[in-house]
Amino acid sequence: MEVTRKADMKTVDGPAGYFTGKATITGQFQRPDPSRVSGAIVHFEPGARTNWHTHPLGQTLIVTEGIGWTQVEGGPVHEFHAGDILWCPAGHKHWHGATAHAGMTHIAIQESLNGSPVTWMEKVTDEEYLRGPAGKDQ
Protein backbone atom coordinates (compact mmCIF):
# COMPACT_ATOMS: atom_id res chain seq x y z
CA MET A 1 0.00 0.00 0.00
CA GLU A 2 1.29 3.43 -0.91
CA VAL A 3 0.20 6.46 1.14
CA THR A 4 0.90 9.98 -0.11
CA ARG A 5 0.61 12.60 2.61
CA LYS A 6 -1.01 15.93 1.83
CA ALA A 7 2.08 17.72 3.18
CA ASP A 8 4.20 15.91 0.56
CA MET A 9 2.02 16.83 -2.42
CA LYS A 10 3.34 19.45 -4.82
CA THR A 11 1.14 22.17 -6.28
CA VAL A 12 1.87 23.60 -9.72
CA ASP A 13 0.14 26.15 -11.92
CA GLY A 14 -2.07 24.73 -14.64
CA PRO A 15 -0.14 25.18 -17.91
CA ALA A 16 -1.34 28.18 -19.93
CA GLY A 17 -1.39 25.95 -23.01
CA TYR A 18 -4.15 23.82 -21.46
CA PHE A 19 -6.04 26.26 -19.19
CA THR A 20 -7.57 29.72 -19.39
CA GLY A 21 -7.35 31.69 -16.14
CA LYS A 22 -5.78 30.62 -12.86
CA ALA A 23 -5.83 26.89 -12.17
CA THR A 24 -3.59 24.88 -9.84
CA ILE A 25 -2.85 21.15 -9.88
CA THR A 26 -2.02 19.34 -6.62
CA GLY A 27 -0.94 15.77 -5.96
CA GLN A 28 -0.70 14.75 -9.59
CA PHE A 29 -0.16 10.99 -9.83
CA GLN A 30 0.41 8.29 -12.44
CA ARG A 31 0.24 4.70 -11.20
CA PRO A 32 2.81 2.16 -12.44
CA ASP A 33 1.99 -0.57 -14.96
CA PRO A 34 -0.14 -2.56 -15.25
CA SER A 35 -2.40 0.19 -13.89
CA ARG A 36 -3.39 2.94 -16.31
CA VAL A 37 -4.87 5.28 -13.69
CA SER A 38 -3.75 8.86 -13.20
CA GLY A 39 -5.26 11.86 -11.52
CA ALA A 40 -4.90 15.05 -9.54
CA ILE A 41 -6.70 17.63 -7.46
CA VAL A 42 -7.42 20.64 -9.68
CA HIS A 43 -8.54 24.03 -8.37
CA PHE A 44 -10.02 26.67 -10.67
CA GLU A 45 -10.35 30.33 -9.69
CA PRO A 46 -13.52 32.08 -10.93
CA GLY A 47 -13.47 32.26 -14.73
CA ALA A 48 -10.81 29.55 -15.12
CA ARG A 49 -11.42 26.50 -17.30
CA THR A 50 -9.68 23.79 -19.30
CA ASN A 51 -9.22 23.82 -23.04
CA TRP A 52 -11.40 21.51 -25.07
CA HIS A 53 -10.02 17.99 -24.67
CA THR A 54 -10.79 14.27 -24.85
CA HIS A 55 -9.84 11.23 -22.78
CA PRO A 56 -9.25 7.89 -24.54
CA LEU A 57 -10.92 5.89 -21.75
CA GLY A 58 -13.14 8.57 -20.17
CA GLN A 59 -12.77 10.72 -17.06
CA THR A 60 -14.39 10.92 -13.63
CA LEU A 61 -14.53 14.24 -11.77
CA ILE A 62 -15.36 14.30 -8.06
CA VAL A 63 -16.29 17.86 -7.11
CA THR A 64 -15.01 18.76 -3.64
CA GLU A 65 -15.59 22.52 -3.45
CA GLY A 66 -17.46 25.29 -5.20
CA ILE A 67 -19.53 25.50 -8.37
CA GLY A 68 -18.45 24.66 -11.90
CA TRP A 69 -19.55 24.41 -15.49
CA THR A 70 -18.92 21.69 -18.07
CA GLN A 71 -19.91 21.10 -21.66
CA VAL A 72 -19.60 18.32 -24.22
CA GLU A 73 -19.12 19.70 -27.73
CA GLY A 74 -22.48 20.49 -29.30
CA GLY A 75 -24.35 20.10 -26.01
CA PRO A 76 -25.59 22.49 -23.34
CA VAL A 77 -23.43 23.86 -20.54
CA HIS A 78 -24.18 22.07 -17.25
CA GLU A 79 -23.67 23.50 -13.77
CA PHE A 80 -22.37 21.24 -10.99
CA HIS A 81 -21.69 21.64 -7.27
CA ALA A 82 -19.53 20.30 -4.44
CA GLY A 83 -20.49 16.67 -3.84
CA ASP A 84 -21.43 15.98 -7.47
CA ILE A 85 -19.63 13.32 -9.53
CA LEU A 86 -19.26 13.75 -13.29
CA TRP A 87 -18.47 11.07 -15.87
CA CYS A 88 -17.30 12.00 -19.37
CA PRO A 89 -17.25 8.99 -21.70
CA ALA A 90 -14.24 8.07 -23.81
CA GLY A 91 -13.58 10.30 -26.79
CA HIS A 92 -16.14 12.99 -25.93
CA LYS A 93 -14.72 16.46 -26.62
CA HIS A 94 -15.43 18.57 -23.53
CA TRP A 95 -14.24 21.24 -21.12
CA HIS A 96 -14.80 21.97 -17.43
CA GLY A 97 -13.94 24.68 -14.94
CA ALA A 98 -15.22 27.21 -12.45
CA THR A 99 -18.19 29.48 -13.07
CA ALA A 100 -17.58 33.10 -13.94
CA HIS A 101 -18.20 34.14 -10.31
CA ALA A 102 -17.27 31.13 -8.12
CA GLY A 103 -14.19 28.94 -7.80
CA MET A 104 -14.28 25.14 -7.98
CA THR A 105 -12.08 22.20 -7.00
CA HIS A 106 -12.36 18.63 -8.27
CA ILE A 107 -10.44 15.40 -8.18
CA ALA A 108 -9.85 14.22 -11.76
CA ILE A 109 -9.32 10.51 -12.42
CA GLN A 110 -8.67 9.00 -15.84
CA GLU A 111 -6.87 6.11 -17.52
CA SER A 112 -4.17 6.17 -20.18
CA LEU A 113 -4.28 4.43 -23.52
CA ASN A 114 -0.95 4.01 -25.33
CA GLY A 115 0.66 6.11 -22.60
CA SER A 116 -1.67 9.13 -22.85
CA PRO A 117 -4.62 10.04 -20.59
CA VAL A 118 -5.69 13.16 -22.53
CA THR A 119 -5.60 14.88 -25.91
CA TRP A 120 -5.59 18.66 -25.53
CA MET A 121 -7.27 20.87 -28.12
CA GLU A 122 -8.14 24.52 -28.67
CA LYS A 123 -9.10 27.02 -25.98
CA VAL A 124 -12.73 27.51 -25.01
CA THR A 125 -13.57 31.00 -26.25
CA ASP A 126 -14.99 33.61 -23.89
CA GLU A 127 -18.18 33.56 -25.98
CA GLU A 128 -18.56 29.77 -25.55
CA TYR A 129 -17.74 29.95 -21.85
CA LEU A 130 -19.93 32.93 -20.95
CA ARG A 131 -23.04 31.29 -22.42
CA GLY A 132 -23.18 29.41 -19.13
CA PRO A 133 -25.98 26.98 -18.36
CA ALA A 134 -29.38 27.62 -19.96
CA GLY A 135 -31.68 29.61 -17.71
CA LYS A 136 -28.88 30.92 -15.47
CA ASP A 137 -28.19 34.62 -14.97
CA GLN A 138 -24.57 35.34 -15.87
Predicted features along the sequence, with ranges:
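A short, N-terminal "cap"/entry segment at the start of jelly-roll beta-barrel domains
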Residues: M1-V37, P117-Q138
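Glycine- and acidic-residue-biased ligand/ion/polar-headgroup-sensing regions
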Residues: P46, H55-G74
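Short acidic-glycine-tyrosine-enriched beta hairpin
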Residues: G74-A90
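Asparagine-centered strand-capping/turn motif at beta-strand->loop junctions
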Residues: G97-T99
